[in-house]
Amino acid sequence: MMVEMKAVNENLKEQFVKRNKLAICATLRELKKNDTSLMVHHSHGQFISKILDVVPDNNLFVFDLGGIERENNRALYAGSLSFVAEPAGAKVEFNAEIAKTVTYDGLPAFSAQIPELLYLIQRRTYFRINTPLWPPLTCRGELPDESVFLFTIKDLSLGGLSLYTDRDTTGLLTEGDIIKSVEMDLADHGFFCVDLQFVGQAMVKVVDNKGEVQLTQRLSFKFPSLNAAQERDLQQVIFELERLQNEKKKRFQEL
């Protein structure tokens, strides 16, 4: 079964495509150099990986196994794989088939032929994922009036996040304000200390756990200065949240 590439309008793909092998290898090497996470989709599931090596002379690249042995076995016999990576300000997509399992630095890994086509899409917007209701992910910091806040993260991307709060923050923030050293508690997914730049706020209607509609404030922020390590780790979190969401949807569909 062929896994189709997503997220790029068919009419626009040609302006993003790379067909030159040297250019494709350069992009793969850049993903390796920056330790960028890859989301690997196939007909039986998905897993998170990283490129370990690029070997143009053998027309191969090597990538890491996923964390679950069952998923690795499924991927090995799935046929075509669809790879998606999201380095800063861009999106990389390509298809490949696993050639075989190999040993790399003493550990098992997958190898595949270097793709004939690769899409490098420069983006102005980032993929945004809604966070789970439980456990709640939170941000803690200090507002310009020196009061401490603890707000719930509603959604998250490499570009920024949105926070929900019942607290009236009207007039406390103006567009462009930067809140320094905000503590992002992402539960099992880790802890980050970041700066947030205020974009805007709005009143929105949400449904609480009792099924009742409530009004709450939505505060939007962007990340003005993520370093490479923070960006890499945050991308890993976003991939993991997406994987968990997809698994949950699949379970509901099977009921």
UniProtKB/Swiss-Prot annotation:
The keyword Aminoacyl-tRNA synthetase does not apply. Keywords: Bacterial flagellum, c-di-GMP, Nucleotide-binding. One of its GO terms (biological process) is regulation of bacterial-type flagellum-dependent cell motility by regulation of motor speed. The gene is ycgR. Belongs to the YcgR family. The keyword NADP does not apply. GO terms for cellular component: bacterial-type flagellum basal body. This is Flagellar brake protein YcgR. GO terms for molecular function: cyclic-di-GMP binding. Acts as a flagellar brake, regulating swimming and swarming in a bis-(3'-5') cyclic diguanylic acid (c-di-GMP)-dependent manner. Binds 1 c-di-GMP dimer per subunit. Increasing levels of c-di-GMP lead to decreased motility. Residues 122-240 form the PilZ domain. Its main location: other. It comes from Pectobacterium carotovorum subsp. carotovorum (strain PC1). Monomer. Interacts with the flagellar basal bodies. It is found in: Bacterial flagellum basal body.
